[in-house]
């Protein structure tokens, strides 16, 4: 009797061939401390990931409490240091409670899976993060996507929805590939008119926007406007993990029903300690945020004089939309040879024809770093013209 054919090998080969043909084959850059580079690709907006105070807090907590939490939060992994961090995050965002998750992706999946099912209707901005799209899909919710930041389109879709269906409106706070900011107040008003809850993922706003770094939601929009607030700890705060903030009933519900929370080992205590230190720095050193916004404005001004195709972003995320995948890769490779790391973003992360360099600014970028980036971009322009 002959062996059965292996359908998986052919399936994987076909997918790889198609991704190569589309010009979207992804590769992981392995970075070395032997060959230093200037990072304009990461999300370390306040420069805290390399701050020695965070590293020391993490090391001290690891020595005292162990390298890992050893169990999930609901078994024996929820330590006093996690409890302290949740209280601080609730305080920062002006919510009664917060709940830690291991990653931002897991937080969004956990919320949507716990709140939604096939009876639920979810309305999402078309440019929402993949974790929000995937979460609604995995929950089995009836999902519709409205045009980017188009409140009239959202209003039209909500008006057509059955009145008896639990409804959730979902949006990024700061859109990670464009750098523009959701109109949170207007979204909240639209959701309330239709009896819907609003969920905002403020991954790129927390630590950057708001009067005290509380994000584009934070204390400016209370839990009645935004019942579900998600934030991440691995971007402006420089550590790792994520959280959901809201009222008592929401957090209790997530503890009971959010499977990515229930069935995951708690984050290492050292990570929680580093995040607590980051929150101290955020509170005591507001000049970091001021410096970040100065750097973003400096880049926009100088890039504008070069005639680079900027978007309307006023955040540290500054995309240069080049359109063509091959062109984006040429520019990124040329910049890499000059010791400059930028994001080369192609479909399916962004729509086809909108490939871009995703440039992110940090409070720690000095004048020399910014000058090197601008000179590198000018060189790309000159070489292309020639």
Curated annotation (Swiss-Prot):
It comes from the Bacteria. Catalyzes the decarboxylative condensation of pimeloyl-[acyl-carrier protein] and L-alanine to produce 8-amino-7-oxononanoate (AON), [acyl-carrier protein], and carbon dioxide. Homodimer. Substrate binds at residues 26, 129, 349. Pyridoxal 5'-phosphate binds at residues 104-105, 176, 204, 232. This is 8-amino-7-oxononanoate synthase. Keywords: Biotin biosynthesis, Pyridoxal phosphate, Transferase. Its EC number is 2.3.1.47. Its cofactor is pyridoxal 5'-phosphate. GO terms for molecular function: 8-amino-7-oxononanoate synthase activity; pyridoxal phosphate binding. Belongs to the class-II pyridoxal-phosphate-dependent aminotransferase family. BioF subfamily. The modification N6-(pyridoxal phosphate)lysine is found at residue 235. It catalyses: 6-carboxyhexanoyl-[ACP] + L-alanine + H(+) = (8S)-8-amino-7-oxononanoate + holo-[ACP] + CO2. One of its GO terms (biological process) is biotin biosynthetic process. Pfam families: Aminotran_1_2. It comes from Chromohalobacter salexigens (strain ATCC BAA-138 / DSM 3043 / CIP 106854 / NCIMB 13768 / 1H11). HAMAP family: BioF_aminotrans_2 (MF_01693). Pathway: Cofactor biosynthesis; biotin biosynthesis. SUPFAM superfamilies: PLP-dependent transferases.
